Amino acid sequence: MALNLRKNHPLLKTINDSLIDLPTPSNISIWWNFGSLLGICLMVQIITGLLLATHYTADTSLAFSSVAHMCRNVQFGWLIRNLHANGASLFFICIYLHIGRGFYYGSYLNKETWNIGVILLLTLMATAFVGYVLPWGQMSFWGATVITNLFSAIPYIGQTLVEWAWGGFSVDNPTLTRFFALHFLLPFVITGLTLVHLTFLHETGSNNPLGIPSDCDKIPFHPYYSIKDILGFALMLITLATLALFSPNLLGDPENFTPANPLATPPHIKPEWYFLFAYAILRSIPNKLGGVLALAASVLILFLIPLLHTSKQRSMTFRPLSQILFWILVTNLLILTWVGSQPVEHPFIIIGQLASFSYFMIILVLFPIAGVLENKLLNP
C-alpha cells in the first residue's frame, strides 16, 4: 500500500492520473507545451498579484500613490509590479499561441474542451481589463470609461446597465473598488475553469500533429513531457525576467504614469497591445451598436469554429489550402493589432475596415470552402 500511495490515495491518484501516468501521444510537438505554460503564468500572476494586493489601496485618492509607494519603498516592490504587469502580456502571448495551435491542428473537435477554453479566454480578458484600471493612471481611467460606455449601446437597458456597473454617473471611487474586488476574484474563477478544461481534455486525451487517433502509441507524461515542459518553463521565465528587468515599460502606455484626471482626455485612448485587434474591429464600424456587436463577435466567433469544420481530415498538416488561409489569418490579426494602435485617420481607417472584413470572411466563409475543396482533391 505504502509503495503505491501515488496510485491509491484518493487525492494523489487524481494528480497522478493528470500529471504523472497520463497516457500522452508520442509525437506531440512543442506547440503542446503552451497549456502547461499558461498554468505557470496563472501561478505567477496569482502569487505576484497577492503580494501587490497587500500594499495596494483601492481608493481613487490613494490608488496611484499606493502603486508608486510600492515601487519606491516596498522591498522588491518594483520587481513584483513589473513581473505582474509583464506576466499579463506573456499570459496573452501564450493563450493566443495555444488557441492558434488548437485551430491549426483541429483540437477544437474536442468540443467541450474547446468551449471551456473560449470561456477561459473571455474570463482572462475581463480580468486583464479590470486589472488595468487599478493603477488609476490616465489610460486606466479613460480606458475604463470608453470600454464600460460601450454597454450603453445595448437598446433600452444600456444606460441603466452602465450606471449600475459604474456605481454612479461616471467612473469614480465605487467603480475602482468593485474592479479591485473583481480583479481579486476572477483569477480563482480561471483556476476553477482550468480544472474543468483539464477534466474534459483527459476524457478524450490530447490531439496530435497528425490529427489521427493515437491510442495505439501512448507514453507516460512523466518523465518524457514533464522534462520537455521544463524547457518551456525556463524559456518563458527567462523572457519574463528579461522583460521585467531590462524594459519593464516596453509594452505599457506612458500616459499611465500620469494620475487619472477626468478633465483631461489623452490624445489617443487605446487598450493594452493584447486587445488591439478587437479594438481595431470595434473602431472600424462607424455605428456604436454595430461596433460593439463586431467586437463581441471577434472573440465569440471561436465558439462557431467546431461547427464550421468541413474537412475529412482533422489537422491542417496535410491541407495546403487551409494552411495558406491560416497564415493569412495570422497576418491579418497582426495588421489589426497594428491598426488598433494608430490614430483614427485616413489610411488606418480603411486598412482597419478591410482587415476586419477579411477576419470574418476567412473564418466564416473561406475556411469551410477550403475544407470542401480539399475533400474534392482527396477523391477527384
UniProtKB/Swiss-Prot annotation:
Cofactor(s) listed in the protein's UniProt record: heme b
GO MF terms, alphabetically ordered: metal ion binding; ubiquinol-cytochrome-c reductase activity
Pfam families linked to this entry: Cytochrom_B_C, Cytochrome_B
GO biological process terms held by the UniProt record: mitochondrial electron transport, ubiquinol to cytochrome c
Designated name of the protein: Cytochrome b
Binding site for a ubiquinone: H202
Family: Belongs to the cytochrome b family.
Binding site for heme b b562: H84, H183
The organism of origin for this protein: Drepanornis albertisi
Record note on cofactor: Binds 2 heme b groups non-covalently.
Summary of the function given for this chain in its UniProt record: Component of the ubiquinol-cytochrome c reductase complex (complex III or cytochrome b-c1 complex) that is part of the mitochondrial respiratory chain. The b-c1 complex mediates electron transfer from ubiquinol to cytochrome c. Contributes to the generation of a proton gradient across the mitochondrial membrane that is then used for ATP synthesis.
Miscellaneous comment in the UniProt entry for this protein: Heme 1 (or BL or b562) is low-potential and absorbs at about 562 nm, and heme 2 (or BH or b566) is high-potential and absorbs at about 566 nm.
Entry's localization field: Mitochondrion inner membrane
One GO CC term, this protein: respiratory chain complex III
Binding site for heme b b566: H98, H197
Membrane topology, record value: Multi-pass membrane protein
Subunit note: The cytochrome bc1 complex contains 11 subunits: 3 respiratory subunits (MT-CYB, CYC1 and UQCRFS1), 2 core proteins (UQCRC1 and UQCRC2) and 6 low-molecular weight proteins (UQCRH/QCR6, UQCRB/QCR7, UQCRQ/QCR8, UQCR10/QCR9, UQCR11/QCR10 and a cleavage product of UQCRFS1). This cytochrome bc1 complex then forms a dimer.
The entry's keywords: Electron transport, Heme, Iron, Membrane, Metal-binding, Mitochondrion, Mitochondrion inner membrane, Respiratory chain, Transmembrane, Transmembrane helix, Transport, Ubiquinone
Residues spanning the membrane: 34-54, 78-99, 114-134, 179-199, 227-247, 289-309, 321-341, 348-368
Gene name as annotated: MT-CYB
Predominant subcellular localization, coarse grouping: mitochondrion
